[in-house]
Amino acid sequence: MNKHDQKKKRNKQHTDNVMGKKSKGFIKNKKNIGESGNEKKRNNNFNNIWKKKKRSGNSEKDQVDILGLLKGDSENMNDDDDNNMNDDYNNNNIKGDYNNNNIKDDDVDDDDYDDDDDDNFDENKNCNDNCSSKHKRNVPSKKEHDILELNNINFNETRKKMINYKNIFDGKFCDLKYILSESLINTLEKNEFIKMTSIQKMSIPLFFKPNDIFLKSMTGSGKTLCYAIPSIEKILNMKEKVKITRDMGIFVLVLSPTRELAIQINNLFCILTKPYPYIVASCITGGEKKKSEKNRLKKGISILTCTPGRLLDHLENTKSLKLTFLKMVILDEADKIIYLGTQDKIKLIYDMIRKIKQEEFSKVHKKKKKEENEVLDHINDTNMSDMNNISNDHSNDYEQFILDKFQMIFISATLNHAMKTLANYCLTNNTMWIEKEKKNGINGGNKNDETKQKSNDMISCMNRENSPLNIHNNDDNDDNDDNDENNGDNNNNNDDNNNNNDDNNNKNNDDDNNNTYELPEQLKQYCILIDMKQKFICLIYMLLDCIEKKKKPVVFLSNHHSVEYLQILLKNIYWPTDVNKKNIEVNKKLNEKITPVLEREDEKLLRKHLEQNILNNNYYNNNYNVGNISYKNINLEEIQNEDELNDEPGNLYNINADKHKRIYLFNNVNIYILHGNLSKEDRLGNFMDFSKTNNSILLCTDIISRGIHFDSLSVVIQYDPPQILEEYIHKVGRTARLNKQGSAYLFLLKSQKQFLNILKNKNIQLKIILGNTIINHFKKFCIPNFLKSVGKDILNFLHNHMQTIVKSNNTLMEKGTSAFLCTITSFYSTSKNLRSIFNAKDIHLGHLAYTFLLEKTPKQISKYKKEQNYINIKKQTVLSKKEKRLLKSKQFQKKQKRK
């Protein structure tokens, strides 16, 4: 052998010993190996690559050990589990290094998901940071142990779920050509309704049957199109036999619990009925003049969406309401209607519509009999051909569509005992139960995941006897029998049909324990465990973070007073820019040493501002010439001391001195509010403006918690705890709709941890974020640089500043006191299930006042509220001249400030 061949053998043996069997995978071009110098370079490169490979392998094992800690297991994971995780990783083609930060649900998503989203809000990251110091001992800390007991997440399973989360779309609307007309399919495609969800695919054909239907599906699955498309198609099918006009009256009636949802449903019907001018869609929700609504009803409405109270009023008082050709009555978000306590109105509406339909059908039936008798009388005088012409009259064509029955449809995402009783009362015609079900025992993450997921999701369609609507209790059956007997008495004894509220609540609680809820898998749910004092600052950080990432957040609150208070407060909050020199000693006690906040540029701006104020005052008060005033030698310290005399001694900030250079936290951000006490115009205006604008925040009560759809809504924040368990599910369902990603955050105190266990029983798991982590992020990323010199107690510094803002504004004080008192009363209206967890007695009222930025004690706040109510009443009454002077006097205002 040549020397050259011997060198080749040695180099090959060396590379095989170092790299083993995997050396083949790293050698790209074997043919080019010829010269000895190039061979040495390549071999060195191979050695370096293999060393890096070994290091990365060791780090992966260490990271898997950390995962074992996060699971709560003292033992490390097996090698088989490691191989399975690596196989899943390779199969799913996820980009990025397989390190500890990537093993979390925030980052393991589709390629479209942004890496920056929710990096700061990951509780696994917090756990990993805490576990890094304890990794050597393999012993978690107490905080970690508490979190792990609550979390109990199998990371391997959740990771697979988030990689292969379920696609709710299944087919296209053009696949339903055998049911839907071409024109309707074209209108759907023009309006970008191309794909349909699995619940739409299975339920739309069933709506063409005459049976009553109860449709139950998760939020964001497209339930409105499930009934909107068949209702329009049924009217189009009538067109083949009869000319459709507005005089025929209402064909489809949709009942909605709120105005906003009714408007949204009506907008969808208006879009789908644009090519059909003879189909008129309209909305009646109250708040308008009845004359205008009656005029619209006289002209004729084909598809009417309305609220229950307004419809009941028109059924009782408006004669122009035509229901002769009524085909469908749809109750959307039925659980919300029951929660609002309007189930009695719906029973009345159902009975009245049923009575009207039977009367009109009997009239038509009598007409038919008269015509038949007339035909029989004239048989001898007429031929058979003439008789056929009589039977083919246009009036008979219209009469064949007049029926004594109509299709009743219930649509909801949840089910409870009160809903069952209402459904059993209204759904009487061979009721069909449609629900999306899951089979247990099918594990995701294998190669055949997609085929298994299709078999995993099933649409169950069953009769009343086999459905969850069947109530097996004898007491309930007796109640239903009593209700059926009272139906024929023209609703004279409607109060006897209602059960006691306490009995209904107990039945609801027992029934809720058996139900489990389904939510979209792409929805990320977080629970923020905080102390009461940290609550407001955590909210500010989350809102600022959403604005930076260009996300639209919705904040749910318990009452309308806190909604109005937060709106005014967020608009008026600004960073502290000027510190009183009189109170610099107070700041030194808080911190060892504080550098002056004002810089030279700020001093120049302040000097110019003060100079102009002096010029204006002298010009208006003394009428001096502006040129004669010597303002060049103005002393800033003397002027500031004069301004400080007007301020209270306890304030840290001179509020009036820094108006010219305030930096507002939510500058150029639109903050909208929605609650039931707003006027109709304001509600509609805020609703439409928020849906159109991008850089905006919505503060609201539970008025939009059900059925409302916002396209670009990505964050839901529940600042106050839910009063009912179902309320949490519906609020969370405003985001992550139609396969879009979204995140939901729930604020909970540490004493309210048991609520997470209740959600676990309902197949809902939340990741926990500690409040301290959010506050640390707030200190790092949100506080401006000129305030970082304050030191560690920056939060107390900022809180005192915000308290002075509230103190100086009378409207903020009034709104804050009313919001504080209403939040306390809201805890007393929680359901019996949650009353032990969200108990008003467990809340520290002083800390609650601290979150509302109120300096006074709870007793002082209640006294202040009584005085304000007394003053407001006195202002409305007729006052004497002395009383008016007393209210305007400075002495009276000073007394109020002291109080």
From Swiss-Prot:
| Location of the protein in the cell | Nucleus, Nucleolus
- Pfam families to which the protein is assigned, alphabetical: CTE_SPB4, DEAD, Helicase_C
Q: Which InterPro entries match?
A: DEAD/DEAH_box_helicase_dom, DEAD_box_RNA_helicase, Helicase_ATP-bd, Helicase_C-like, P-loop_NTPase, RNA-helicase_DEAD-box_CS, SPB4-like_CTE
The Gene Ontology terms for molecular function here are: ATP binding; ATP hydrolysis activity; RNA binding; RNA helicase activity
What the record says about family reads: Belongs to the DEAD box helicase family. DDX31/DBP7 subfamily.
Its EC top class is isomerase
SUPFAM superfamilies xref list: P-loop containing nucleoside triphosphate hydrolases
Q: Where would I find the Helicase C-terminal domain in this sequence?
A: 593-782
UniProt KW DNA-binding keyword: no
Among SMART domains, the record links this protein to:
DEXDc (SM00487), DUF4217 (SM01178), HELICc (SM00490)
Task: List the EC numbers from the record.
Answer: 5.6.2.-
**Could you say which residues bind ATP here?**
S217, M218, T219, G220, S221, G222, K223, T224
Keyword Kinase among UniProt keywords:
no
Would you tell me the protein name for this molecule? ATP-dependent DNA helicase DDX31
Its taxonomic placement starts with: Eukaryota, Sar, Alveolata, Apicomplexa, Aconoidasida
UniProt keywords (A-Z) are: ATP-binding, Helicase, Hydrolase, Isomerase, Methylation, Nucleotide-binding, Nucleus, RNA-binding
Task: Tell what the record comments on domains.
Answer: The Q motif is unique to and characteristic of the DEAD box family of RNA helicases and controls ATP binding and hydrolysis.
Which PANTHER family is this protein grouped with? ATP-DEPENDENT RNA HELICASE RHLE, ATP-DEPENDENT RNA HELICASE RHLE-RELATED
Q: Where is the composition biased (Acidic residues)?
A: 76-85, 106-121, 476-487
What is the native source organism of this protein?
Plasmodium falciparum (isolate 3D7)
